[in-house]
Amino acid sequence: MSFSRSAADAADTLPDLAATLGAPALGAFVTLGDAFHTRLPAAPLPAPYVVGFSDEVAQLLGLPASFAAQPGFAELFAGNPTRDWPAHALPYASVYSGHQFGVWAGQLGDGRALTIGELPGTDGRRYELQIKGGGRTPYSRMGDGRAVLRSSIREFLCSEAMHHLGIPTTRALTVIGSDQPVVREEIETSAVVTRVSESFVRFGHFEHFFSNDRPDLLRQLADHVIDRFYPACRDADDPYLALLEAAMLRTADLVAQWQAVGFCHGVMNTDNMSILGLTIDYGPFGFVDAFDANHICNHSDTSGRYAYRMQPRIAHWNCYCLAQALLPLIGLQHGIADDDARAERAVDDAQAVLAKFPERFGPALERAMRAKLGLELERENDAELANKLLETMHASHADFTLTFRRLAQLSKHDASRDAPVRDLFIDRDAFDAWANLYRARLSEETRDDAARAAAMNRVNPKYVLRNHLAEVAIRRAKEKDFSEVERLAQVLRRPFDEQPEHEAYAALPPDWAGSLEVSCSS
C-alpha cells in the first residue's frame, strides 16, 4: 500500500495504513529505545467525521488532493484503524519532563498525543505525523487523553496561519471530530488534530533525562537531534555546546517574530519549547487586538508570567533550563579528568552562550520593526521610534494588526492621509506627535510612498487569526457546519493580500469578542 495510490482503490488501501507505518516508517525517534517512549494503540473515537483538512500539508507529504475524500480517512486520522495495529506499527507517546509556570513539574510526556508515522516530504525532509486527542497514555496523569473540538480547530487554523505568516511552526493536516462527550469547564465534544513536524522533541525531553541522572540517554537524545537536525554542530569544538547555541538562536529568532505580529503563545512552559525553534502546542494562544504590552491571552495565567511583553524574557529563561539539562554533556571532548573542573568549565561555557540571547533577539526584533515601519535604511534611533509607537499604541489601546497595516497609507508629505490609522488612537494628539517623528524619519528614505507601502504590506498582515474569528468557526462547527473553518483557513493562507471580498475578516473585533476567554482546559 502507498499513499500515492489512486482514489479508486482507496477503500482497500487506507485500512492497511497502520500495517505499513511501522519501523522504520515510524521514524528515527522510535529507534532510540523504550526509555524514550511507550508504544500503544490509540483509543477508538466513535463515528468520526472530517472537520478540516489542509490540502497544502497533504501536498507537502506527497498525498493526493482528494485524500480527505477517500473512504476510511476519518477513521484513520481518528486513530481508528479498521484492523489491529501490528506490533511493529504501534504508535508511540514520548516521555519528557519540564518546568510549568516556572516551577519544576517532574515527569510529563505525551498525555494525549501519539506519533503514528513518518512520511517523506516533497521538500526533501521527513515529517512525523502526530495525532492529538488519541486517548490516554501512561503520561496522561489525571487527564482523559482527549482533545476537544474547540481547541483542535484553533490549533488547526493557527498552525497554518503562522506558516503563511512566515513564522516557524508545526503544521496541521486535519481535524477529525466526534460526538463523544468530554468534560472540561463544560460538556464538549471530542476531536483529534493531526500535527505534522520534522520533530516533536522539546526542551523537556532533555530535562527529563538530566533530572533522572541518565547522562547516557541524554547523550543519545542529543546525538539524535544533532545528527538529524543540526549536523553542523557535529563539526564544532563542542557539539553539545553548539547544539545549545543553535537551539537558543532559533528560539530568539522565533520569539522576535512572535512579537512582531503580536502573537502570544500563552503557555511557554519548557515542555512546550521545540528544540527546532518551532511554534508548538497551540493552546490558549492569541493575537493581540487592542494593544496592551501586558496582554495575557491565557486566563489561567493569573500572574501574567506569559504576557506579551514577558515572552522574550521567558524564552531566555527556558534556554537556561535547556543549558542546565545539557551540562553533563558540555565539555566531554576536552578530556578534563577532574569532574568538578569539567563541570565548572561547562557552566562557564554555557553562560557565555546564553549571554548571546539578547544579542540575537534585540537586532532580530529591530530588523522586523524597521521592516514593519517601511524603513529601508538603518538609523541609530529606529528602535526608539518603534518603541515610541508601541507606547502610544499601548496608551490608546490601538489595534495592533490594523495600526501597522494602515501605516502603509501614511504619506511622507501629506498629513491629511493619516485618518485611517489615526482613527485607531484615542489620543489623536499623541499619534500626531509620533507621526511627525515618523515623517521626519521617512524624509531620509529614498523610496517613494508607493514603494514603501508595497514593502510594508508584504510584512504587515491584514489578516490574523483573531479569537472572535476562530470562535465563529467553532460555533458553526459545533452545528456540523464546517464551511467557516474552510473559509477562514483560505483567508489566512494569504494574510498579506488585500482580499477585498473578505474585508470583514480584517475588521476591528466586535464588542462581544472582549468577553472571550481561552485557557489550558482543552
From Swiss-Prot:
Where does the signal peptide begin and end?
A: none
Q: Which GO terms describe its molecular function?
A: AMPylase activity; ATP binding; magnesium ion binding
Its EC number(s):
2.7.7.-, 2.7.7.108
Q: Which reaction does it catalyse?
A: L-seryl-[protein] + ATP = 3-O-(5'-adenylyl)-L-seryl-[protein] + diphosphate; L-threonyl-[protein] + ATP = 3-O-(5'-adenylyl)-L-threonyl-[protein] + diphosphate; L-tyrosyl-[protein] + ATP = O-(5'-adenylyl)-L-tyrosyl-[protein] + diphosphate; L-histidyl-[protein] + UTP = N(tele)-(5'-uridylyl)-L-histidyl-[protein] + diphosphate
Q: Where is Mg(2+) bound in this sequence?
A: N272, D281
Q: Does the keyword Manganese apply?
A: yes
Q: Which residues form the active site?
A: D271 (proton acceptor)
Q: What class of enzyme is it?
A: transferase
Keyword check for Cell division, yes or no.
no
InterPro entries given for it? SelO
Q: Which domain of life is it from?
A: Bacteria
Q: Which cofactor does it need?
A: Mg(2+); Mn(2+)
Identify the residues that bind ATP: G109, G111, R112, K132, D144, G145, R195, R202, D281
Q: List, alphabetically, the Pfam families matched.
A: SelO
Q: Which UniProt keywords apply?
A: ATP-binding, Magnesium, Manganese, Metal-binding, Nucleotide-binding, Nucleotidyltransferase, Transferase
Question: What the protein does?
Answer: Nucleotidyltransferase involved in the post-translational modification of proteins. It can catalyze the addition of adenosine monophosphate (AMP) or uridine monophosphate (UMP) to a protein, resulting in modifications known as AMPylation and UMPylation.
Q: What family classification does the UniProt entry report for this protein?
A: Belongs to the SELO family.
Q: Which NCBIfam families match?
A: PRK00029.1 (NF000658)
Q: Which HAMAP family match?
A: YdiU_SelO (MF_00692)
- This one is known as Protein nucleotidyltransferase YdiU
What lineage does UniProt assign to this protein's organism? Bacteria, Pseudomonadati, Pseudomonadota, Betaproteobacteria, Burkholderiales
Q: Per UniProt, what is the name of the gene that codes for the protein in this document? A: ydiU
